[in-house]
From Swiss-Prot:
HAMAP family: Trigger_factor_Tig. Involved in protein export. Acts as a chaperone by maintaining the newly synthesized protein in an open conformation. Functions as a peptidyl-prolyl cis-trans isomerase. SUPFAM superfamilies: FKBP-like, Triger factor/SurA peptide-binding domain-like, Trigger factor ribosome-binding domain. This is Trigger factor. Keywords: Cell cycle, Cell division, Chaperone, Cytoplasm, Isomerase, Rotamase. The keyword Cytoplasm applies. Belongs to the FKBP-type PPIase family. Tig subfamily. Its EC number is 5.2.1.8. The lineage of its organism: Bacteria, Bacillati, Bacillota, Tissierellia, Tissierellales. The gene is tig. It is found in: Cytoplasm. Gene3D superfamilies: 3.10.50.40, Trigger factor ribosome-binding domain, Trigger factor, C-terminal domain. It catalyses: [protein]-peptidylproline (omega=180) = [protein]-peptidylproline (omega=0). GO terms for cellular component: cytoplasm.
Length: 440
């Protein structure tokens, strides 16, 4: 079998292969043997019907599709190796008419890894944000600690107000008919969280525990459930209880309870130092990202949509895991936020394209700059891993890791880090001051 390249352009290749008649006939026989136990005909035991009898009864091409599928993976792999192609997607496959005792012609269409040359990266420049710790940043961190140590207590004798947590029963109606998903009991809702559709929470404010009342709202025109889009709705509601958050007193005693410090000033100073360290890392990541973006801008590169699709799907899975950590599934999240999977994926697409292009230009940069990982760097990284994962026998851990497939991923990671470091060193950065950002 030899592959014939029909075309190779715009990051896509089209090529053909011929399956020899003898190979196809053998695959038909193999398919028959594999599947015959599924068939029965009158006068024969199940699984014992001769192939020709089955083909006469069910059609001559009964086993053709399965026979081709048995052969295609091997044919495809040999073809891309012979033609020296780097596919980045599953191929589309077209078959000519298939008949027994004849060669089978197969056409493959597949997206390819882009071929490109890096642009001039000798004078890269980029604008980056200044990450500066302010007093308000420190106060925000302190307030977060206060919130974390707050207690929630039930209140009586006053109306519900914003930021209260209310336990409610509700049942929704559209055109005087209850609708699916519109009913709950003892639902805890934080007023002002905008968890529900516009107008719902505002009508809870001002009511007391024990009150029963109607809430009238209108579903948004872009609501995720088609049957409810733009519809007027009535919710029969009852407030079971009202709770408020009580923050602890911010003083030296609070500081002693939540930290190793004795005074509020010492505590705030430590918070500021930690925030500044965090900002150093944020600044480094910002420089790396902007340097890669500058390299992309200097390079003429287009990528197949399939590569972007794959990255969008990967990022969506990350998003779904984060939603799960919030105690929700994606359907619940979409209902609460009035969005859809398509909306989220559309939002991810621009960043996914940037990620794909960034990976490609950085890979090319590593190749052009001949960046390699050394044994010393590998050992140093593995020693760090041994510490992090609490491996007592460091030498054994390092030896086992070096003999595992994961060592190649680690080598690539080391090369990537070195490339980013070099790229940042050779990029001129203009820092956009915090005041400039506020003015814009």
């Amino acid at each position: 079998m030899s592959a014939v390249l029909v075309s190779k352009e715009n990051n896509q290749a089209v090529f053909t292969c011929e399956i020899p008649a003898e190979d196809f006939n053998n695959a038909i026989e193999e398919s028959y043997k594999k599947n015959r136990s599924r068939f029965s005909l009158k006068g024969f035991r199940k699984g014992k019907v001769p192939r020709k009898m089955l083909e006469r009864a069910y059609g001559e091409g009964l086993f053709y599709e399965d026979a081709v599928n048995l052969l295609l993976p091997g044919i495809y792999e040999k073809a891309i190796e012979e033609l020296e192609l780097e596919p980045v997607s599953q191929p589309d496959i077209d078959l000519d008419d298939i008949t027994e005792n004849n060669d089978v012609k197969v056409k493959f269409t597949v997206d390819l890894k882009p071929e490109f040359e890096l642009g001039d990266y000798s004078k890269l420049s980029a604008e980056i944000e200044e990450f500066k710790v302010t007093d308000s940043d420190v106060d925000m961190k302190v307030n977060h600690e206060l919130e974390s140590n707050a207690r929630v207590q039930e209140v009586e004798g006053r109306e519900a107000k914003e930021n209260d947590t209310v336990s409610i029963n509700f049942k929704g109606f559209v055109d005087d008919k209850a609708f699916d998903g519109g009913e709950a009991e003892d639902y805890e809702l934080v007023l002002g969280s905008h968890t529900f559709i516009p107008g719902f929470e505002e009508q809870i404010v001002g009511h007391n525990a024990g009150d029963e009342f109607d809430v009238n709202v209108k579903f948004p025109e872009d609501y995720h459930e088609d049957s409810l889009k733009g519809k007027d709705a009535k919710f029969e509601c009852k407030i079971n209880s009202i709770k408020e958050k009580v923050l602890p007193e911010l003083d030296d005693e609070f500081v002693k309870d939540v930290s190793e410090f004795d005074t509020l000033d010492e505590y705030k100073k430590d918070i500021k130092e930690h925030l500044e360290k965090d900002n150093e890392q944020r600044q480094l990541v910002e420089k790396q990202n902007k340097a890669v973006e500058a390299l992309i801008e200097a390079t003429e590169i287009s990528v197949p949509e399939s590569m972007i699709d794959n990255e969008v799907n990967r990022q969506f899975q990350d998003f779904a895991r984060r939603v799960q950590q919030m105690g929700l599934n994606t359907d619940q999240y979409f209902q609460i936020t009035n969005t859809s999977e398509e909306d989220v994926k559309n939002e991810l697409r621009a960043n996914a394209e940037l990620k794909v292009k960034g990976d490609l230009v950085l890979e090319k940069y590593i190749e052009k700059e001949a960046i390699e990982s050394t044994d010393e760097e590998l050992d140093e990284q593995l020693k760090e891993f041994a510490k992090v994962y609490g491996k007592d026998d460091e030498e054994k851990f390092i030896e086992e890791f070096k003999n595992s497939p994961n060592v190649e991923f680690l080598k690539e990671d080391i090369k990537r880090k070195k490339a980013l470091e070099k790229l940042v060193e050779n990029t001129k950065f203009e820092i956009k001051k915090a005041e400039e950002k506020e003015d814009k």
